[in-house]
Amino acid sequence: MVKESIPKEGENIKIQSYKHDGNIHRVWSETTILKGTEHVIIGGNDHTLVTESDGRTWITREPAIVYFHSEYWFNVICMFREDGIYYYCNLSSPFACDEEALKYIDYDLDIKVYPNGKYHLLDEDEYEQHMNQMNYPHDIDIILRRNVDILQQWIEQKKGPFAPDFIKVWKERYKKIRDY
């Protein structure tokens, strides 16, 4: 990643998700950067336009904090709903940034975490199907399986974006930047 392409705090960026074959998967039109370093990007968004690969659009329903790390093969969306905080974790390539957007490859597997701390691994069938269709290399499969384990450990240990202080700090920072 080029250092100049790291987004700065307060900057609004697009997030583009791709599939392994290079096709666009999903685009979030606007996310406000709360922290941008070469290793970690934290952003916030609320009622953001999302465009699917088939052109369909929808708008996110609630405020969310997004977490990307350059060394892990996952990203995390922390969604603030009336009944608590939900997490949607995408198994994905580490992020890359350029002038156009923050970008990553979505590898189908997801983990949904509920406010009570319980979680479920989702879309294993889709992962198997796409692994065969798009010829995911064996090394990628090993990396992704290892990162599922890491992600589950983080969830259980309340580490990284799952730590209560993480949510408090970044939700407050997003509110300040947004209301400024």
Swiss-Prot record:
GO molecular function: magnesium ion binding; nucleoside diphosphate phosphatase activity; ribonucleoside triphosphate phosphatase activity
Alphabetized Gene3D superfamilies for the sequence: FomD-like
InterPro entries: DUF402 (IPR007295), FomD-like_sf (IPR035930), Ntdp-like (IPR050212), SA1684 (IPR016882)
CC cofactor: Mg(2+)
Catalytic activity: a ribonucleoside 5'-triphosphate + H2O = a ribonucleoside 5'-diphosphate + phosphate + H(+); a ribonucleoside 5'-diphosphate + H2O = a ribonucleoside 5'-phosphate + phosphate + H(+)
Chain sites annotated for binding Mg(2+) 2: 108, 110, 123, 126
Record's function text: Has nucleoside phosphatase activity towards nucleoside triphosphates and nucleoside diphosphates.
Family the entry assigns: Belongs to the Ntdp family.
Name of the protein this chain belongs to: Nucleoside triphosphate/diphosphate phosphatase
